[in-house]
């Protein structure tokens, strides 16, 4: 793994933490539940792969999109 790859993954990990916190705050969830929703979301691989520059979207926007995907699947 290159230094650039390591930096990108560090940035993504920080983004995931902010998404988890935003989802917990917006929907009254525990951090554990928010983390579970994020890591099982079909959007996570798209964010990781940079599809449509999703990783550039705001944390709250992504938290809401992930929440909507979760509730629609329920």
Show which residues each predicted segment covers.
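C-terminal alpha-helical interaction appendages
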Residues: 1-74
